[in-house]
């Protein structure tokens, strides 16, 4: 493999054995592609904004003499960029402008004659725009729209699994689900009649809907039944024989063939053998006794032609009297319905008998009564309602997907079709459910991913936008029908508010619009790749059963079987598998390699769950010989959702990668294949909670996906184009672009501005640091700067810690963790948290609040950190209770005491009519002020501090832009100099020409002169651009802010808190091995090895066997080897060994392992590159062991040997306190540990006195309310068990809700009288009141 200059800095040794056929696709594409489809113009008008407009427009007036037509739309540019929106707390959105055409028709002239056309561009609200990283900024906070997994539109057949009826009979049902519109259900009842429900209302006999579709009884019978023909003879009947229909019946008479030979005697069951004999003898008719027809149903009406009397009605049971009547009337032939109990049930015939309606109108009225109970039905209303339910394009849409699923399920050839239902569709569904009831077909599996589809951002936003448009449509139609349209323009007809409101509601408060989890880069990526079955139109937690939550065979390669939350949402929220994507219908598909005649090709095809069932698919880890053929005869495969063994020749596809089945979070776990699934789930979930540490440390044992994840998450800065690093400082990187990657006539400079110390959604710190130096060559995609939790472009969520598995004085009992003081001293797990505190000055009824340093009754010391405007200085160290922003609020008029009146008379009015409402630092918080932002309403005078901040921002903007301009200008001038040198100018001559005059030289070569003029023009453009950009920036900074009504000023203070690791913090490994720190132990007391090196962390060995996450032990061994190799390299560098020796050792390391694919050609590295690589490997050689394709035990032993460590991975340790050796050898090595965002500082608090609940007068609970610890029922039992009566009394009275008792208690304590007089607890009075409210009087007797 060829490595770029920056990739050579540190190469991860990969133990993967399988060739990479496909790189992991861009991880955020599910979000970005979906939203792009929404905003891009779609010429076909099938999706996005275009589809929404086309579905609602043109809007015609009720009279038909005017209409509003849609022409086109365009999205403008957002006013503020993403960062500005976050600072100002506004939404990052673009204005939507739509070109509309109003057409007026001439009332007098022929229909369709146009009288007037007006076209105008109309503003239709703002559409929130997606940032480059797949998020939305809504009101200043980053949010993610989670994709939803919902039931695909189409038709589904199911049964109740025998749960509805007490007999346990299985009742079948069918459901037609449209994309929008009413649901149509068909279901059997226990008596086998078929019923229909519309929108889950009251059920009606299914034949009612057929009658409403203009089918008569006769039509219905002909649709669903075959006929048996009988000829009436004198004493018997002759039946037309179809031998197959007799199967399973008991012969009630002798059956003879045409020659009179006996085939079946009376009383015998007719079997398949008898039927074959009948077919052989070509018997077409059979003479049967007269009573054979009794009990069968007539297939049509039989009428006496002479009198017109109906002798036998269709679907009525035939009796002997009926036969006699028919004979008398001279009717020779009679047809009956073919019905048997085995596989041709009488379901529709039975249903017709229950059906009280006889014609279309009665059926429509019945449906109307069911849908609109209590309303008097009229013919028009009934017809209109039924028409609108399933046959109107405005009210009903199956969608493209729905039609495709519908047609495929009912075996209709084409996939395309109408969005509304047809008569034939409804009949086909009824026929299919009867087929299923008759045993000819199977029910569907609703948890199959072929029946569930993904709705992503774009589609949901489009639906909301359409909802808004439909609201507008009603208003427009009314306006078109009302006033004089000659005066009006399209702008006057459209009110954009409902559209904005619908879109805003969706992005702001929909269940699927979530506050982005921004703990670390992994949590961002997983949040964007999350697939939820909850939300509008989805499931609810309470209703979802076990089957929906379970892992389904079709999840393979589509949804991760491991990563899902624990708790009530388990299985309802899933994560997209690494290689999965959605197809044009919204179904998930996964890639497979094509296998042709047992040879594996490199052709990759994506298959959806529906298509996959038809093929035989081998796993990725099958043995393959040198020619790419499968080495074994029998191959482990998947076919039709089952795992089985098949011949190599039958295999059609093969997995592309062993990591295909799991999500990115799960594929970050090394040795995942050795962990129990439950623990792997916890491991995957806990990595998302890791807090970025002060200095990121790459994992020694990784899986090789770390770089992909870090780059795709967008937290690192990756090079857009190749070139050479020209300038680097903490906040900017400048790259001079390679000549071959330039566009014509550009400066050839890329400038990357870095994010510094910004707050994330979870209050963690986002900071980017350059990881390249001037003069380094870079190629496209190289990492130039690390973000939070990344180290040289690798995701780094935690720290590599030296751990030992052994008990230590009970300090690691029950998963507790013992850590060394050195870990805290070296700031290994120190994290920075940034809190945003806001102070809002409002206009109140009594006057406006004021931000000032002049605060009543506050000492000088409390104001020491504030400036004259009353706002804290940047850089001030503050602690709990300190004032950050001084604010006073007007007080209501109160009755003044004579003393106060006197004071007022002497010192003037202002003395006491304001109260202090300053912003203070919350208790238990201590930190440094790193930034202050002041927002002032337009028209309100800015204070001194606001003007200072504004001035600073303007200066900073000028400096930044000036430097950018200088860099770009230098690029242009440099190219101009090179041009002049190429036409014969000497260096000396160039040195004499003033800098700017280089561009106005005149040269003979015409083409070169043109080039020079182009550069000069470009220089002018750059200057104009600079001035324009600066002016825009300056205007944005100095303009007033658009604040909420009644708000005059907002001050935001950013406070950075440094949190070191301490007892009570939660830590975890990557294998679900979590624990709480129990003690920070002095370094000298920690166990140490024979060389005197103490361990950092001691873990309990009992945490491994029962949890079955053995991956952590292998990780520790591999980590020990990796670190050992790093130590060896360090020793070689310190001893200044020959480079050849160093090169040889590094080469040996990279070549270790059986069949390992990775080839690192160390020989091609220069000496400098080898030394730089070795320097970066001093801390240990990073290792990749991909999931399901990782390092084997043998390879771990080889690594340990290479590091000069015992192959067992165990060392003799000594006790740090006594110096004695421990009895047994101990497993010691390096494990990657994470500090999770469950910090003891955020959880622990203690209450002295605080607020009480209003009704019960008991102390509140929880840290936010400064609450107490609940002394609950069980705690009371404990005190009762000890017989501690007085303690118990104290707990239930003066320490809780005995109001008088607790105030008296203070006095007693102050007086030194340590006694208590318990009284009546307030909650007892509440109980009395509740009993009285039930109408039972209860009085307390005073003794």
From Swiss-Prot:
Catalytic activity, EC: 2.7.7.6
GO annotation (BP), single: DNA-templated transcription
GO cellular component: DNA-directed RNA polymerase complex
Name of the protein this chain belongs to: DNA-directed RNA polymerase subunit beta
Recorded catalytic activity of this chain's protein: RNA(n) + a ribonucleoside 5'-triphosphate = RNA(n+1) + diphosphate
Description of how the protein assembles with itself and partners: The RNAP catalytic core consists of 2 alpha, 1 beta, 1 beta' and 1 omega subunit. When a sigma factor is associated with the core the holoenzyme is formed, which can initiate transcription.
Family statement: Belongs to the RNA polymerase beta chain family.
Keyword Cell division: no
SUPFAM superfamilies: beta and beta-prime subunits of DNA dependent RNA-polymerase (SSF64484)
Organism expressing this protein natively: Shewanella frigidimarina (strain NCIMB 400)
Record's keyword annotation contains Transcription: yes
